[in-house]
Amino acid sequence: MLLRSAALCRALLARRGRAAGLCRRCVSSLQVANEPVLAFTQGSPERDALQKALKELKGRTEAIPCVVGDEEVWTSDVRYQASPFNHGHKVAKFCYADKALLHRAIGAALAARKEWDLKPVADRAQVFLKAADLLSGPRRAEVLAKTMVGQGKTVIQAEIDAAAELIDFFRFNAKFAMELEGEQPLSVPPSTNSMLYRGLEGFVAAISPFNFTAIGGNLAGAPALMGNVVLWKPSDTAMLASYAVYRILREAGLPPNIIQFVPADGPTFGDTVTSSEHLCGINFTGSVPTFKHLWKQVAQNLDRFRTFPRLAGECGGKNFHFVHRSADVDSVVSGTLRSAFEYGGQKCSACSRLYAPRSLWPQIKGRLLEELGGIKVGNPAEDFGTFFSAVIDAKSFGRIRKWLEHARSSPSLTILAGGHCDDSVGYFVEPCIVETKDPQDPIMKEEIFGPVLAVYVYPDEEYKETLRLVDSTTSYGLTGAVFAQDKDVLREATELLRHAAGNFYINDKSTGSVVGQQPFGGARASGTNDKPGGPHYVLRWTSPQVIKETHGPLGDWRYPYMQ
């Protein structure tokens, strides 16, 4: 519910001295809170609804079109999305947009831009607030089921992603956008100054990943909320859930041409949008090579753009847990198991390297191996006791298997547990822990994006040197955690690891950021660190205009010193 702040509106009116036209832009206070994460216990209404939705998807293939304007477009370039844990089940049949259709989508978006941008932010926000309500209520089970079946997520991983986080993105972004309207420059009589937060001039290309349904909704949704028009290229391996999110936005009142839903071949999409003079932004989550390629394409075409495109990218990480000898072992073990192996290590923030002190390693190792035996890997749609499921596709499976082959063949690496792979039914990889004698081995440096945890054991007295090693080993800077009870060590670690992580955790796991609480993102090779989930992110998708109005004659053109 939008609560109008009459007092603040009156204050703004008095300060600016021009009542006409300002009420439309008066600041609103939107009260929001994080969406509760449902438990899905036996016999609960949410569990019953989810099981019903999963049953409806069993053996079903949904046909998904490109949507340009208000028209569903079916092309001859047909693709399929397979369920990761049962690749014989094609969950979606969709078609790729070619260059001609993408150009048509650009034209349709541009035609709608001016009217959408001129709408008051409160009106645009209502669309996303309604979408959040639909996700929170009648459409929750559908989106969760499609995320589980299509992307291989367990109940809880789907819930914290496709429900809680996406709902939070829509609600908090609406709050941040409306509060931004209240950020106005100082006015000094006889003039009043105001700031208009316009959308960008052109279209934004949103390119989303497979691993979070919420990220796709936010990459397209946040720029649209701020008055922009968007071409959304969803991931081939998240098509089912992405299309559901798009339909919910339309059901919530999003006009037809604001977000164009255009599945496409990656290079075709990239070439087309970066060659358009109207490109004004790219909102991206994916691999470093892809983002670098898009950046280079923008640079090569710089002279043709009407405006400098905004480039926002999140590109993953090689995230760490550093353990000091003063750490609580229970916290280390529980936090590391969750961070490294939830969703099969396919989170951008997943812990992929652990630095353990020699004095604690026997205890930590014993506990990790003991608990690892209780992790169930399987079909999350049929067994709610599954901790994680298959990795996303054959390409990912093959890449992870090569890392495991490296672990078996390298003299500096020892597989302590797990590592078996089986792709006969789904793309299953056992959780694997690898100990290394070489802290510079590639397994400690490069992103794996799978259920593989690399461990380096360091001498206790060399913890400062090891902290420097943590900072310098990889090119990434996304997330990391330090486990210690010694306050001096925590202070030293915070200073030495200042640029090693954009999201830094103390005595907590490296995953699990919450919208509004821990805005997410990192620098270095991890991206542009624009912090979606925080108040500054929406500003990224605006082009502010300052208006000065002087109330009275300007007087003599001559300066006093000239007399």
Curated annotation (Swiss-Prot):
Catalysis performed (reactions): L-glutamate 5-semialdehyde + NAD(+) + H2O = L-glutamate + NADH + 2 H(+)
Pathway(s) where this gene product acts: Amino-acid degradation; L-proline degradation into L-glutamate; L-glutamate from L-proline: step 2/2
Keyword Cytoplasm attached: no
GO BP: proline catabolic process to glutamate
Enzyme class of the recorded protein, top EC level: oxidoreductase
Residues noted as binding NAD(+) in the record, renumbered to the chain: 208, 233, 286-290, 447
Transit peptide (first-last residue): 1-24
Residues recorded with modification N6-succinyllysine: 93, 99, 114, 130, 175, 347, 395, 509
Modification Phosphoserine occurs at: 44
Gene3D superfamilies recorded: Aldehyde Dehydrogenase, Chain A, domain 1 (3.40.605.10), Aldehyde Dehydrogenase, Chain A, domain 2 (3.40.309.10)
EC numbers, comma separated: 1.2.1.88
Site (Transition state stabilizer): 211
Gene Ontology MF term list: 1-pyrroline-5-carboxylate dehydrogenase activity
Residues binding substrate: 513
Localization per Swiss-Prot or TrEMBL: Mitochondrion matrix
Active site (catalytic residues): 314 (proton acceptor), 348 (nucleophile)
Modified residues (N6-acetyllysine): 52, 93, 99, 114, 130, 175, 318, 365, 376, 509, 531
Family membership noted in the UniProt record: Belongs to the aldehyde dehydrogenase family.
Stated name of the protein: Delta-1-pyrroline-5-carboxylate dehydrogenase, mitochondrial
Upper lineage: Eukaryota, Metazoa, Chordata, Craniata, Vertebrata
